[in-house]
Amino acid sequence: MTEQNTQSGFVFNLEKIYIKDSSFEVPGAPQVFLDTTNPEVGVQLGISHNQVNAEQGLYEVVLAVTVTAKHADKAVFLAEAHQAGLFRIGGMPEADLPKVLEIACPNVLLPFVREAVNELVGKGG
């Protein structure tokens, strides 16, 4: 995941990708597995970012996903994953930085957090 434009000096590198936090809860297990009706599922996304090292142009971006499933106001499961990436970004106008941190970086992280949530839900029952 490296994109460099040597003529303009633009740098966009994914240096490291990692799970910062994950959790899975099935508060009503094992009784909840006996219910065959489909639960109501909700998905929430959140993005956060912070500068790790200004001289090196390093930024941590975290894409947080929370999936809740409920049936008759009772929680079936709660899955949460915070997928993080360490990005090296530089050589661009300061005004463009928020777009990169809030659009381009989460776009890179999305397939990884989707896989993490899929594994949590799949292994959780």
Which residue stretches match the model-derived regions?
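N-terminal intrinsically disordered, cationic/polar leader segments
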Residues: 1-125
